[in-house]
Amino acid sequence: LHADILKTRIFKGSYQIFPQKYLAITNGITHRRWLALANQGLYHLVREYVKGDILKDYRLFEQILPYKDDKEFCKKYEKVKRNNKIRFAKYIKEKQGIEVNPESIFDVHCKRLHEYKRQLLKCLHIIYIYQKIKKDPAYITTPITFIFAAKAAPGYARAKEIIRLIHSIQEMVNKDPDMDGKIQVVFVENYCVSVAEILIPAADISEQISTAGMEASGTGNMKFMMNGALTIGTMDGANIEIAERVGQENIFIFGDSAEGNYNKKMYHTYNPGIIFENHPG
């Protein structure tokens, strides 16, 4: 996708002169760190069912597929996931003094703070759910913990304003007794690789909701997928290749395509007011 965008739009003239200089290479991650080190419980579970050394050959993971509906395997996996969630809950309690329910769904938006990565969209989603619960306490039946982890560039004022908004939503939601046992918001402070190794294995839902056409690849989507989180995302970056690999039934895709977004920008056809008026909520 993004190789085509470079060739046909951004560097169209250069590509026509030097086509041999353009080569698309997708980002990648190492399962040695993001599985074997970060999620040792899952790593040891996988080793029980895989013949061979998965540290040397990641393709051996495909040997797990026959066990996807195996009750014993699923029970063991559920235990691993719960232990990881308890580990994260202990970490956030020690570092930030926030009590997190490990039995809740961990809905995680974890990446660099940028407008195109759309942490703001997730904020609006949380506010929408909050208002729904205020009107109808039975709207949420399974508790959800919305987790943000991000840093903004030093000079990126709007990104810092979004972080400020997240903190305001966190305070509003967490201090409202009507939200007890329903939803909670957590902003993870001082996010870094070491914290990611605790958070990513605990995630139930992976938010990969960048504006289609803006994310060159991304690696967080791969890390979360490797650790068993369900991906909600747009057809952008590596989400496209993940969807092709796991099948559309195993990833939750929404939103317009990169081409659709480009056309809206070019022809000035995007009107959020119309969407708002037709979906009063």
Place the predicted regions along the sequence by residue:
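Flexible loop/turn segments at secondary-structure boundaries
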Residues: 2-6, 30-34, 115-116, 122-123, ...
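Extended, charge-enriched "interface" segments that sit outside catalytic cores
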Residues: 38-99
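Long, K/E/R/D-enriched contiguous segments that form extended
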Residues: 82-196
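Substrate-recognition/cap regions that form aromatic- and gly/pro-loop-enriched pockets
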Residues: 23, 139-140, 155-159, 163, ...
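Catalytic binding pocket for nucleotide-activated donors in carbohydrate/polymer assembly enzymes
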Residues: 18, 26-64, 201-202, 209-281
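Short His-Asn-centered micro-motif
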Residues: 148-149, 187-190, 208-211, 233-235
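Extended catalytic-interface subdomain
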Residues: 1-12, 272-281
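Donor nucleotide-sugar binding/catalytic pocket of nucleotide-sugar-dependent glycosyltransferases
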Residues: 1-5, 12-30
